[in-house]
């Protein structure tokens, strides 16, 4: 079985290869999200939804930056970045995406000790030459970052300008059942009520899937 450190290393290397203009700040942000997901509690789901709608509206009128060709980008620890620029053709409702995000933020905690251990994995990758960043530059960044109390941070200007990142960090279980959520939302376009039957052998996850649907939709189980 792959260790947590090895999994994180794979994630870091994949992202650096996929986004070669990643800076140290962007890698640290990736490690932070691997530990804390969105990094904050969502007290008001409606305000979160309004921000999501505004961001997607801005994306629709923005032709700059590289466009993602995948809906989800794995960030390890059972989490993904759901990339907003890639969802228009899927038919998924923004209310559904927002609920993915809210549920994930409310269920993930993380801790600073674990974050520091994961930053050590990042440091080891730089020391080994697996990532194109000088260990001394990383250490200087982390020294200042630690002094600030390890807050959630934004992407670097280089990353923002080239990749125009717009995403929500969500639990990977939503990726695993994304086709089902898209199908449900498509049905809700034409009818007020959707009945879903989950037919599978005992112990195959019917109860877990039912609970997941109940967390996303206002429904009876």
What are these regions (language model features)?
Residues 206:
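Conserved lysine of the Walker
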């Amino acid at each position: 079985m792959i260790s947590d450190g090895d999994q994180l290393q794979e994630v870091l290397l994949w992202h650096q290869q996929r986004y070669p203009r990643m800076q140290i700040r962007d890698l640290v942000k990736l490690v932070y999200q691997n530990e804390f997901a969105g990094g904050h509690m969502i007290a008001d789901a409606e305000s979160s939804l309004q921000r999501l709608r505004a961001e997607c509206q801005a994306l629709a009128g923005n032709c700059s930056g590289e466009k993602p060709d995948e809906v989800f980008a794995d960030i390890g620890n059972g989490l993904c970045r759901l990339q907003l620029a890639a969802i228009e053709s899927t038919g998924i409702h923004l209310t559904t995406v927002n609920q993915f995000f809210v549920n994930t933020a409310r269920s993930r905690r993380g801790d600073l000790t674990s974050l520091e251990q994961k930053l050590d994995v990042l440091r080891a990758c730089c020391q080994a030459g697996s990532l194109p960043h000088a260990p001394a530059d990383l250490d200087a960044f982390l020294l200042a970052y630690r002094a600030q109390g390890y807050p959630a941070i934004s992407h670097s200007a280089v990353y923002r300008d080239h990749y125009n990142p717009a995403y929500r960090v969500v639990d990977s279980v939503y990726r695993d059942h994304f086709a089902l959520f898209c199908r449900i939302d498509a049905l809700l376009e034409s009818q007020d009520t959707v009945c879903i039957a989950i037919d599978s052998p005992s112990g195959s996850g019917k109860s877990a899937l039912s609970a997941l649907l109940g967390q996303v939709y206002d429904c009876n189980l």
